[in-house]
Regions:
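Terminal, non-globular segments
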Residues: 1-172
Length: 172
């Protein structure tokens, strides 16, 4: 338990540094930023305690907010994604993660993985962009910006997942 918690904290620090030092300096067309740090939450084991998951989400989101000076926007978006993560796993796997303590998350098909990643990254980008703008008159511009950011984040996430494949049973 303690060893896995320490490993998760180390992984969280890695994603914070990756986001802050590399991906915060990438701005596509002055329009969209990739948010790769969300992979920390998306790749945590499905058996992770719900409260620990929300705590990890708040911690990584808050750390990104501190470095980006965004006043809680990333913390909100990351906690929202963490909150919606298990219900989406339940929906995609036809199993209840809360009852079983574990799921067939590691055995997701490519389509299930794709839906899981796309939906949660899109939710993250939409929530960040909507809160940052606080305007509805540019709604379609916000949606366009979110879709471009989501696409870039998904491509970078796929590169990361293919470069560092998760362990089948213990990692995810």
């Amino acid at each position: 338990m303690v060893q896995s918690s320490l490993a998760n904290v180390g992984k969280m620090i890695f994603f914070i540094l990756l986001q802050v030092l590399i991906f915060n300096n990438i701005n596509f067309w002055g329009y969209a930023n990739p948010y790769i740090y969300i992979l920390f939450i998306l790749t945590l084991p499905s058996s992770t305690n719900r409260y620990a998951l929300l705590l990890y989400a708040f911690a990584i989101g808050f750390a990104i907010d501190v470095f980006e000076h965004t006043g809680g926007v990333n913390a909100f978006a990351t906690v929202l994604v963490a909150y919606l993560r298990n219900p989406l796993i339940n929906l995609l796997s036809n199993q209840n993660v809360d009852e079983l303590g574990t799921s067939k998350f590691a055995n997701f098909s490519f389509l299930q993985w794709s839906v899981y990643i796309v939906v949660l990254i899109l939710i993250q980008h939409l929530s960040i962009d909507l809160i940052e703008s606080l305007q509805w008159h540019n709604f379609w511009l916000i949606v366009e910006r979110s879709l471009i950011g989501t696409l870039i984040s998904i491509i970078l996430s796929a590169i990361y997942i293919l470069s560092f494949p998760p362990k089948r049973q213990s990692e995810i």
